């Protein structure tokens, strides 16, 4: 199953997910040279805060190692996945919401499901998707909560010509309401 989700797990030279995610973060004003000038963006300009969702912890490892540690070391991030102790998850969420210097929160879709309030983020990136479209919608809703004052942009990275593209096409059709005559 992992190879269907990300060819990078099978052949490291074929996946552009870290590169694409890097470009989205740069477009959001995160991780570029402007982060290093005076430690932040210009005064009065709101910085974007990002939630990055992956279905598998292995893909979070790829994003963390190849994107943040190697390509974008100036990006500050936190991570929460199934191995995060349940007693520490609330503290991770509270810290991310309260500390505007943290640019990104990496999450697995399942740990970022019901009950979390992450309204400090205004950008959601799905690097890999859950086959159940409702789980992705629940994860997306973490940023679309009461109290959200900014527009939330959602990016879905899907590799063209893959089985994932076909499955996501079917999943989006299955999530549409049916009309009955």
Kindly give the residue locations of the regions a language model identified.
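ASCE P-loop NTPase motor core, strongest for the SF2 helicase catalytic module
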Residues: 1-181
């Amino acid at each position: 199953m992992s190879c269907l989700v990300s060819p990078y797990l099978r052949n490291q030279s074929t996946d552009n997910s870290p590169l694409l995610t890097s470009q989205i973060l740069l477009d959001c004003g995160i991780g570029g040279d402007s982060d290093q000038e005076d430690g932040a963006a210009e005064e009065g300009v709101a910085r974007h805060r990002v939630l990055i969702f992956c279905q598998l912890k292995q893909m979070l490892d790829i994003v963390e190692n190849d994107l943040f540690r190697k390509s974008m070391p100036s990006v500050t991030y936190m991570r929460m996945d199934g191995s995060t102790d349940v007693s520490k998850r609330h503290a991770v969420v509270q810290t991310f919401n309260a500390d505007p210097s943290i640019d990104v929160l990496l999450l697995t879709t399942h740990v970022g499901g019901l009950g979390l309030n992450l309204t400090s983020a205004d950008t959601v990136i799905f690097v890999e998707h859950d086959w159940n479209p409702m789980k992705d919608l629940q994860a997306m809703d973490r940023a679309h909560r009461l109290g959200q004052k900014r527009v939330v942009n959602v990016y879905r990275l899907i590799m063209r010509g893959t089985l994932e593209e076909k499955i996501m096409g079917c999943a989006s059709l299955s999530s549409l309401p049916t009309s009955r005559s």
